[in-house]
Amino acid sequence: MKTLLLTMVVVTIVCLDLGYTLKCHNTQLPFIYKTCPEGKNLCFKATLKKFPLKFPVKRGCADNCPKNSALLKYVCCSSDKCN
């Protein structure tokens, strides 16, 4: 029984990412993503303000949420693949 418990603990440690890293989409395609570098704790998505369809023009990792501009609206989030 102790062996089974120890095995489960070892498998859990191996399977979990001990140093949490955020994964963000980094292209317009929603199924492609990258692991963010250390210190980049937010995902962002930029869309054109004046365009009727809210198609993302830029996605990626950020340390701070970028500020909206005259053309782009930024939305930020902090969970995996949330952008």
UniProtKB/Swiss-Prot annotation:
Q: What is its main location?
A: secreted
- Tell me the leader sequence span: 1-21
Query: Does the keyword NAD belong to this entry?
Result: no
Keyword Signal among UniProt keywords:
yes
GO:BP terms for this protein? killing of cells of another organism
| Tissues showing expression | Expressed by the venom gland.
Q: Where in the cell is it found?
A: Secreted; Target cell membrane
Q: Which GO terms describe its cellular component?
A: extracellular region; membrane; other organism cell membrane
**Molecular function terms from GO:** toxin activity
Q: Which keywords are on file for this protein?
A: Cytolysis, Disulfide bond, Hemolysis, Membrane, Secreted, Signal, Target cell membrane, Target membrane, Toxin
Q: Which cysteines are joined by disulfide bonds?
A: C24-C43, C36-C61, C65-C76, C77-C82
Q: Which InterPro entries match?
A: Cytotoxin_Cobra (IPR003572), Snake_3FTx (IPR003571), Snake_toxin-like_sf (IPR045860), Snake_toxin_con_site (IPR018354), Toxin_cobra-type (IPR054131)
Q: What does this protein do?
A: Has low cytotoxic activity.
Question: Of which family is this protein a member?
Answer: Belongs to the three-finger toxin family. Short-chain subfamily. Orphan group XV sub-subfamily.
User: What protein am I looking at?
Assistant: Cytotoxin homolog 5
Q: Which organism is it from?
A: Naja atra
The top of its lineage is: Eukaryota, Metazoa, Chordata, Craniata, Vertebrata
